[in-house]
């Protein structure tokens, strides 16, 4: 699965999350998002998460050293296959609930790190 056209070109911190969406760069978005070096995109991940759900992130491997995966309200480990795909691509994968993922992404973005985030929306 590839991401939809960029909702916001470029990088921006996540200002708020909850109620099924996110706020960033003075905008709000309903649903899950991918925050990649090239922009912020609407994202409809498979359940359970699979490689095709993260293909857009993998396509930016040269610009990203780490992907923060926010799995929703609760922490949920991705499959060994998903972990292996990221390891093989040379991208670190950190998994946590979406709230922690937003905070971690913002800190690393503020440090100008080569980071991305795949964030599942929470109610």
Feature roles, as predicted:
Residues 1-52, 110-122:
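Non-catalytic interface/targeting segments
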Residues 61-96:
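Mid-chain, well-packed structural core segment of small domains
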Residues 92-120:
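C-terminal structural segments of small proteins and small subunits
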